[in-house]
Design a protein with these regions (language model features):
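Short linear motifs in intrinsically disordered/low-complexity regions
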Residues: 3-6, 42, 121
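A charged, well-structured terminal subsegment
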Residues: 96-123
Length: 127
């Protein structure tokens, strides 16, 4: 898998307010209908604050109404727990590692019929 197959956004705790605004704008623009899959990588964060959660909720809402795949990389147990508490893990696929998210995209590209319901919240997730 190469970077041309998806867009990866790494959320950083030390980003300035200006950098956060630019990231938010680029992320929202990437969630246009029919766009490449988007991965939001939270693995560099020790925890999620309210701004991070707001961003993810907004992204989930945008992605749900469009034909675009949005995946999250929790990176840590505390992040995964917060994603479960906010119910984001019930509407978006959540992975522990970036490599796992990239593999999921590669599998969906190789076997599209098998992964047609990969974002269905009713399906159990093994990631």
């Amino acid at each position: 898998m190469n970077s041309a197959d998806c867009r990866i956004f790494r959320i950083s705790a030390d980003a300035s307010l200006r950098e956060q605004r630019v990231l938010r704008k680029e992320l929202f623009c990437s969630l246009r209908p029919g766009a490449l899959p988007v991965i939001v990588d939270l693995s560099s964060l020790m925890g999620l604050n309210h701004d991070d959660i707001d961003l993810l909720l907004d992204c989930a809402a945008l992605a749900s109404g469009r034909d675009v795949r949005l995946l999250l990389v929790a990176g840590s147990r505390p992040n995964r727990v917060l994603l479960e508490i906010t119910r984001l893990s019930s509407v978006l696929p959540v992975f522990n590692l970036l490599a796992d998210a990239l593999d999921s995209i590669a599998r969906a590209k190789t076997f599209p019929a098998e992964n047609a319901f990969a974002s269905d919240p009713a399906r159990p997730r093994s990631a």
